[in-house]
């Protein structure tokens, strides 16, 4: 593979691009402002679709873009137009954010040159790369999903000039918060340069999430005004305190959208090669965005691998989350867990030890692939999300299903006899209702998105505790608080990796909006001054307990087998009376209570779950030489007092005379 992009030497810059269908390619050189084209030079063919040109006298900091000419026949997937300035697919930096304009989508000869509308690629000498260190994150840890801009936009302790940027994540106040939650790794929602969907600007809206990239390496200047160095420094600062960094990357589509979308980069260079097409020439839309990246094309495959290696080598990230990951595994249109790209990622010497997380669905044929990725890929587990919500909503017959989810979802991840779960357990994520909204809204409230509430999922498996949305009724407020505690406790008690979305630990709300991608405003910005500090303290106590009791974060499936030489089963499932759940209990559709008793050589942990609305006294089995104590001091109740309805309590069994494991304030 030829080296693509801009390679800087002491004598000048070598520019290289690839296109299998273009007849001519140029590089346009701009002045230091990026506003004036000062030279347009034709690249020379080097065979197999590669074009290159060495330009003497240019130095780091030079601004440029590509242009391509060839047939223009959109009905056949050919979009060549030399009036369209194109971002280098290998751009590591662009000089300004993208902004949608109708001329970017104009047909050939219908609009003026687009150079004035386009960011320019900056030829940069990459900063000195940090040493490549093993990932800090290990399966079973806590992933903290966050939107860089929304997370610190309103944080009072972060300097104004840093708010909403990657650099803010290294601020001491942010690090302290992450440490209190026991965060193993932050998962940054997309930080690469993206463009608004064309319907948003007329509505006065903008894309707040970033899942609409143009190219894959260049960081968004709004999120990383300091460029790659800013990301590198932040990753290093977080690593210094034991927190890894995972990047959420979008390789399934780009912001060039459908046939009515803008021509920004890949479309103008070789639309037929970079995107998947139907036999009639139309774009395949397995993503719901108008196009689908052709990850089975060798040049695209290498570009994805180069991007991943870039962020490992240059920024030191722990790993990646892959949005709509089945697209990466589609070969000739069908998903294959052994597809060349997935196999290459898993076996690449730079990438093979990284954290790899798949969102295991897209909207294409057979797009739901939960459990079908191969190790080492972890997978977002939406069945966990839905089943936990159903249990706490009060659905009948959910006790057995809840136990399976708590135990690592062996029905999903043990199909091939794997010994450990690859589940990423979560109850709420960026896409959907927040944790607080799950217990306050029965239906979505997306009118602010400008689509007459048509967007977003309709089945949220949520409940409102008696009133839809805001209320001043104390009883409803308390019920919602209790439900959030119960949901958090269930998550932290679950085997395998867990994920918490930023702000859910202190009751953030989006006012019922379950698709807030277009709300770059107070709907998504975290309100640090109005957070529920009692809920936050409870989340911190849960984190401390999970760290103190390894059985909670172990990724091995719970099977009721003895733990090592202790003879104590790894799990026992009990009724509230302390007796093993019999088949009739498992099949009792009215049952909403159970105890998960985790075994350990030095003592057991009891997770007592009361999903009923009525309080109940729970009884735990006693052992000579051991004593049950509250595992979290804020739940300091004895076993003679009833466990309140819709709550979870933790008791730890220690040898007589020893203290408990977890603390909370």
Range-by-range predicted roles:
Residues 147-317, 324-350, 412:
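Substrate-binding/active-site clefts of carbohydrate-active enzymes
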Residues 17, 66, 146, 188, ...:
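Conserved, mostly hydrophobic/aromatic
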Residues 19, 45-47, 57, 70, ...:
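Short, flexible loop/turn elements at secondary-structure junctions
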Residues 38-41, 155-172, 441-446, 637-643:
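Short, polar loop/linker segments at the starts of domains and inter-domain junctions
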Residues 1-144, 149, 178, 471, ...:
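Carbohydrate-interacting/catalytic domains
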Residues 331, 337-502, 506-507, 515-519, ...:
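Conserved alpha/beta catalytic core and glycan-binding cleft of carbohydrate-active enzymes
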Residues 142-144, 186-188, 245-247, 320, ...:
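Hydrophobic faces of well-ordered beta-strands that scaffold small-molecule active sites
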Residues 68-129, 198-206, 212, 241, ...:
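Core domains of carbohydrate- and sulfate-ester-processing enzymes
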């Amino acid at each position: 593979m030829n080296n693509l992009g801009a390679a800087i030497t002491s004598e000048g810059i070598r520019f290289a691009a690839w296109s299998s269908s273009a007849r001519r390619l140029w590089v346009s050189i701009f002045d230091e402002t990026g506003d004036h084209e000062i030279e347009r030079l034709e690249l020379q063919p080097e065979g197999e679709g590669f074009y290159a040109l060495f330009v003497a006298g240019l130095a780091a900091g030079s601004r440029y873009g590509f242009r391509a000419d060839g047939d223009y026949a959109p009905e056949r997937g050919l979009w060549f137009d030399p009036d369209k300035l194109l971002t280098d697919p290998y751009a590591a930096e662009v000089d300004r954010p993208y902004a949608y304009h109708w001329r970017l989508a104009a047909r050939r000869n219908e609009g003026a040159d687009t150079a004035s509308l386009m960011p320019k690629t900056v030829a940069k000498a990459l900063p000195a790369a940090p040493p490549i260190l093993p990932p800090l994150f290990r399966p079973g840890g806590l992933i903290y999903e966050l939107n860089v801009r929304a997370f610190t936009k309103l944080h009072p302790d972060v300097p104004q000039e840093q708010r909403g940027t990657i650099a803010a994540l290294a601020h001491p106040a942010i690090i302290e918060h992450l440490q209190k939650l026991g965060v193993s790794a932050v998962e940054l929602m997309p930080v690469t340069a993206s463009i608004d969907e064309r319907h948003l600007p007329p509505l006065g809206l903008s894309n707040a999430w970033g899942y609409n990239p143009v190219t894959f390496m260049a960081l968004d200047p709004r999120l990383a005004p300091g460029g790659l160095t800013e990301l590198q420094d932040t990753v290093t600062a977080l690593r210094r305190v034991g927190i890894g960094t995972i990047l959420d990357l979008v390789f399934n589509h780009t912001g060039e959208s459908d046939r009515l979308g803008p021509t920004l980069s890949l479309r103008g260079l070789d639309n037929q090669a970079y995107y998947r097409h139907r036999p009639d020439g139309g774009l395949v839309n397995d993503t719901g965005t108008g196009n689908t990246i052709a990850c089975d094309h060798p040049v695209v495959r290498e570009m994805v691998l180069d991007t991943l290696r870039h962020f490992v080598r240059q920024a030191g990230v722990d790993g990646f989350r892959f949005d709509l990951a089945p697209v990466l595994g589609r070969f000739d249109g069908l998903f294959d867990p052994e597809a060349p790209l997935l196999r290459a990622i898993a076996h690449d010497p730079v990438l093979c030890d990284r954290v790899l997380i798949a969102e295991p669905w897209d909207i294409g044929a057979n797009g739901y692939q939960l459990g079908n990725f191969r190790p080492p890929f972890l997978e977002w587990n939406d069945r966990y999300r839905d089943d936990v919500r159903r249990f706490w909503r009060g659905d009948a017959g959910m006790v057995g299903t809840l136990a399976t989810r708590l135990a690592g979802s062996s029905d999903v991840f043990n199909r091939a006899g794997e010994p450990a779960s690859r589940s990423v357990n979560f109850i709420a994520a960026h896409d959907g209702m927040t944790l607080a909204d799950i217990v306050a809204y029965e239906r979505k409230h997306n009118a602010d998105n400008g689509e007459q509430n048509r967007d977003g999922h309709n089945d949220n498996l949520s409940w409102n505790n008696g009133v839809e949305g805001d209320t001043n009724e104390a009883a409803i407020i308390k019920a919602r608080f209790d439900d959030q505690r119960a949901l958090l406790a269930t998550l932290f008690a679950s085997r395998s990796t867990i994920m918490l979305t930023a702000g859910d630990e202190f009751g953030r709300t989006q006012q019922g909006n379950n698709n807030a991608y277009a709300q770059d405003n107070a709907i998504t910005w975290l309100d640090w001054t109005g957070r529920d500090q009692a809920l936050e303290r409870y989340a911190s106590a849960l984190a401390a307990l999970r760290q103190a009791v390894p059985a909670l974060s172990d990724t091995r499936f719970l099977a009721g087998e003895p733990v090592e030489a202790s003879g104590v089963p790894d799990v026992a499932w009990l009724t509230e009376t302390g007796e093993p759940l019999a088949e009739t209990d498992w099949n009792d559709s009215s049952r909403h209570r159970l105890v998960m008793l985790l075994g350990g050589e030095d003592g057991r942990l009891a997770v007592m779950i009361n999903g009923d609305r009525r309080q109940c006294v729970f009884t735990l089995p006693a052992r000579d030489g051991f004593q049950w104590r509250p595992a979290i001091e804020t739940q300091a109740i004895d076993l003679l007092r009833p466990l309140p309805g819709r709550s979870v309590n933790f008791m730890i069994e220690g040898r007589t005379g020893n203290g408990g494991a977890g603390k909370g304030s």
